[in-house]
């Protein structure tokens, strides 16, 4: 509404009459000349003028008072992003990587108006049994997945020759064993050339190796990998006792016999780190924040456990006393038995949670913000005796709670974490999350099976929250819709203002983006409207997961129309 002063109503021809004033009276203009004091808000929201408080009732504000508009807190900015793991990029060598397609994807995100890119854990994926390709069963909590190293980038660095690159492998599914056979020898060759070279790149490698934040985990990881490569056993539990228990003389012998392997391992980690930094720097130049993902637990057969046995609940021989899992939930009637060793939280607290401080520091080196998977485990965790075969036989135990995050805050500073608070969420989990001001999660696919009180429905969302159409553990929107009971379908269509079934992917995306939650995340499969065959993971199943890729026939250059459609939705709901 336009605001006019009273003087705008006086005709220009109007002549003010002369009014008689008493003698000996000092004339005062009815409109005194205004000074322009500097006002500001203090932390409590009151006006301050130097040492003066709010002007007295009836006094004049400065003439620019109408320009004192409220300013939005930058932390309240509404954002949107895409969930897409780098392995899912299209590309010529059977797996997405940190090469040209990563930069094209960031260009696409920028075109779409997105300011977030969420990835799954970047750790080396599991290789044993049903772990094949799983970033949540990683071999090390801090190392990077070297299969993500781009061969084209190695050519640009002069570490590979163009004629050494393999023939294109056009496949829409990642076969991790096949890809390892193709890429590992070439990445090893590049690492050897780097080690034998001189110049700036070699100097960067040496600086990487000497960095205390890197060496705190890198040396243990390298020794572990070297022993694992030379000793043919299922886990470190079966290693010869001097190696199993890290006797100094045994480790010195490993260094002498496996020095080349250790040096190559470290060089490969450097190459991963270097390529990831280039991708992250480019993301920043586009105004895009990268959100990582951190599993709460680590695998038993890992340098994390081998080098830090006192931080885990192991028996005297080094075998887990109890292991991780969750009780029965929407994904499994008997619960999920994850099998990871559990932390000895009492021992960790005694040394200031140093293991977790180092892990969080590493995450901040890789990501702008990150999700912690199974956040509820910090309040209370499900513990299953290691001899049991099903998770339902476990019991709840008290977690570390706020003292852990106090120690992290003191050592690392403020961190931007997202608390994955799905599943069985008790009041202590809610209070812990709120005490550290971490946003929780809502998933629209969980919203329509009950009543209006369902916390996943958009009208029940909170501002400090991240809303997903679905996560990596959910089906795609199209696949979810195809198997949804008719009653739930009716609920969805009614809630989304009677959209057509053909528009269900767009409808649910709009449902997420229109939420009051500050952050909305959409899996790339949903942007493309894909079905169940493009699902990333089916919880509690053993095979066929983590392999989906954007079809090799598709390029981000050909997805401008999808980007513009998404941008229109984001603009409508204030997320640009």
Swiss-Prot record:
Tissue-wise expression: Present in leaves, stems, roots, and stolons but is most abundant in developing and mature tubers.
Record InterPro entries: Glyco_hydro_77, Glycoside_hydrolase_SF
Enzyme Commission designation: 2.4.1.25
Protein's GO biological process: carbohydrate metabolic process
One example GO MF annotation: 4-alpha-glucanotransferase activity
Keyword Chloroplast: yes
GO cellular component: amyloplast; chloroplast
Reactions the enzyme catalyzes: Transfers a segment of a (1->4)-alpha-D-glucan to a new position in an acceptor, which may be glucose or a (1->4)-alpha-D-glucan
Intrachain S-S bonds: none
PANTHER family from the UniProt entry: 4-ALPHA-GLUCANOTRANSFERASE DPE1, CHLOROPLASTIC/AMYLOPLASTIC, 4-ALPHA-GLUCANOTRANSFERASE DPE1, CHLOROPLASTIC_AMYLOPLASTIC
Role description: May act during starch breakdown to convert small oligosaccharides into larger molecules upon which starch phosphorylase can act, or may change the structure of starch molecules and grain architecture by modifying chain length, or may generate from starch and glucose oligosaccharides which can serve either as primers for new starch phosphoenzyme.
Family in the record: Belongs to the disproportionating enzyme family.
Record protein name field: 4-alpha-glucanotransferase, chloroplastic/amyloplastic
Organism (species): Solanum tuberosum
Gene: DPEP
